[in-house]
Design a protein with these regions (language model features):
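N-terminal secretory signal peptides that target proteins for export/translocation
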Residues: 1-15
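N-terminal leader/presequence segments that precede the conserved core
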Residues: 2-6, 20, 246
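Low-complexity, intrinsically disordered short peptide segments enriched in small/polar/basic residues
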Residues: 3, 7, 24-25, 49
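Generic N-terminal simple sequence motifs
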Residues: 3-5, 29, 290
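N-terminal regions of proteins, emphasizing targeting and processing segments when present
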Residues: 10, 14, 31-32, 299
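Hydrophobic alpha-helical segments, especially transmembrane helices
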Residues: 12-14, 21, 194
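Bacterial N-terminal signal peptides
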Residues: 18-31
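Divalent cation-coordinating acidic motifs and surrounding scaffolds
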Residues: 34-320
């Protein structure tokens, strides 16, 4: 029996549909460059009430030098405001204030984002941190769930960070809860690390008997043709396929990986926020922001426990 759409606490279903219609046609994925709508200063980005937008973004060498460039910080902040939660990779800084300072920049328009950040990781002197930045109006973090996946055999250069989240735009008894597992693989050890991540994914599936939604997301340094290890997991699927995710538009490195039917909340909508197209940047300026584009997927904000929902119409928001 098909799952029924659970009514959401919005002014009206037509209002949510009207918002999606308004957002249709904005620059997303690798669509041809077009004109994204200008957001008025000081007004937080409007997000759809019938979807939560989960993104991943490798902000290349995200540290003091990047935070010292106001124009880069402005673009990064505008990127984050499009999404309900963003998994960040490659925080690389001596200072502990990089992510807090950045979140203050995100919130400069009146938004209410918060963050969780992991420890510095890596086998060499060049350590990296993972972080999750999320809109507290729409997402709640279970801070007791935040941790790093154990890797006693040292198979992963930077073991992934995990945290559990819950949507806040539906009554708590209906809310979609899910694990996010943030990963940046070593480009020199991709096959071995993808094999190890298969075990990580299955361990996260078993971590809590009351939680079957696991979304592994990040910079995998690999695309779907190289996902043979993941295919050992029953029902495995991914959000991004057939498009490039790096800023030069040559490779597919970044993705969101989950299983169906477990994560029935996935709405069949995903994409790549192309920095050049969305913000009108020439390649050299886009590369100052990152050598990766953000990737995203849309999920229904209430738990769905039967057959998957039909794909949603319209496109997701992108702010210039």
């Amino acid at each position: 029996m098909a799952a029924a759409l659970i009514p959401l606490p919005v002014r009206s279903r037509s209002a949510a549909g009207a918002l999606r219609a308004l957002l249709a046609g904005l620059v997303v994925a690798c669509a041809a460059p077009g004109g994204a709508q200008q957001q008025a200063p000081g007004i937080p980005v409007a997000k759809p009430w019938d979807a939560v937008l989960v993104a991943s973004f490798n902000i290349q060498v995200f540290g003091e030098s990047k935070m010292a460039k106001p124009q880069v910080v402005d673009v990064l902040a505008r990127v984050v405001r499009n999404f309900d939660i963003v998994a960040i990779q490659e925080v690389r800084a001596k200072s502990d204030d990089i992510v807090p300072s950045f979140v203050r920049a995100v919130n400069a328009d009146g938004s209410r984002y918060n963050y969780v950040i992991g420890p510095r990781e890596g086998r060499t002197s060049s350590k990296e941190q993972y972080a999750f930045i999320y809109d507290t109006n729409r997402i709640e973090a279970d801070r007791a769930s935040v941790g790093v996946v154990p890797d006693p055999q040292g198979r992963l250069h930077r073991p992934p960070m995990h945290a559990r989240f819950r949507t806040r735009i539906v009554p708590v008894e209906m809310a979609f809860t899910f694990w996010l597992v943030d990963i940046h693989t070593d480009p020199d050890e991709v096959p071995q690390e993808l094999d190890a991540l298969t075990g990580v994914f299955q361990a996260m599936q078993a971590a809590r008997p009351d939680e079957d939604d696991v979304i592994l997301l990040g910079d995998l340094n690999a695309g779907p043709p190289e996902f043979s290890a993941f295919r050992r997991i029953p029902g495995i699927t991914w959000a991004v396929s057939g498009v490039t995710t790096n800023t030069r538009r040559t490779k597919t490195y970044d993705n969101l990986v989950f299983t169906q039917p477990a994560t029935r909340e996935y709405l069949g909508r995903s994409g790549v926020l192309d920095l050049q197209a969305a913000f009108g940047l020439p390649l050299e300026h886009a590369l100052e922001v990152s050598d990766h584009n953000p990737v995203w997927g849309a999920f229904y904000p209430a738990e769905v426990r039967q057959q998957a929902l039909p794909p949603m119409a319209g496109q997701m928001p992108v702010q210039r």
